[in-house]
């Protein structure tokens, strides 16, 4: 299952990002270029993995976007981008978050009180981004029903976002500077 994705991940170079081992992959970084067959396998895999019982798909910038767009088109569910910069629009939700290698604010415009949301993410590393999103959404009356990721580096998805279904296509890691699949 997910043969193209597995092959692509295992070929990923690993770089040091301020002491954090970071794998570079077409799906998580857009580098090297994204093969359409690989993207299609990932999109189909996420659609099969998820329930998508939602009003909106949330796509964290940047690499959630190329995943959410084809899912939105295929399922007919609107998507909204979780941006790294704000617009100051009425109702804008501001989230402070920290990941394994960076921190900063995120901004959501679009979903409103009573909406049900699914987050589509390329990689869950520490779960910091999705935990921050879940708290912010809940405080604005938006129910996060599911988080779907291509890669899971957390090792334990059950703890990623308490009370929310979190699923990933592949469990992965980096050991001694090399990527590995944690099946």
Where are these regions (language model features)?
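Active-site-facing substrate-recognition patch
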Residues: 1-53
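PRPP-dependent phosphoribosyltransferase catalytic core
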Residues: 2, 134-183
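Conserved PRPP/pyrophosphate-binding segment of the phosphoribosyltransferase/PRPP-pathway fold
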Residues: 40-94
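Conserved acidic residues
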Residues: 55, 115, 145
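Short, glycine/charge-rich flexible loops or terminal/linker lids adjacent to PRPP-binding catalytic cores
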Residues: 76-118
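Conserved G/P- and acidic residue-centered "switch" motifs that form tight phosphate/ATP-binding loops
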Residues: 122, 127
């Amino acid at each position: 299952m997910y043969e193209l994705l597995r092959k692509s991940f295992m070929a990923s170079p690993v770089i040091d990002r301020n002491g954090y081992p970071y794998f570079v992959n077409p799906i998580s970084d857009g580098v090297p270029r994204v093969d359409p067959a690989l993207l299609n396998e990932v999109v189909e895999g996420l659609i099969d993995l998820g329930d998508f019982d939602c009003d909106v798909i949330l796509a964290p910038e940047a690499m959630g976007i190329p995943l959410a767009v084809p899912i939105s088109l295929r399922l007919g569910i609107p998507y909204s981008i979780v941006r790294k910069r704000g617009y100051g629009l009425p109702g804008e939700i501001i989230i402070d978050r920290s990941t394994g290698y960076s921190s900063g604010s995120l901004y959501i415009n679009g979903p409103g009180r009573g909406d049900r949301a699914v987050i589509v993410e390329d990689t869950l590393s520490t779960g910091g981004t999705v935990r921050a999103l879940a708290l912010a959404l809940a405080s604005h009356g938006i129910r996060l029903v599911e988080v779907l990721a291509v890669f899971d580096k957390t090792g334990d998805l059950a703890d990623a976002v308490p009370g929310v279904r979190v699923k990933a296509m592949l469990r992965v890691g980096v050991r001694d500077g090399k990527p590995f699949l944690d099946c």
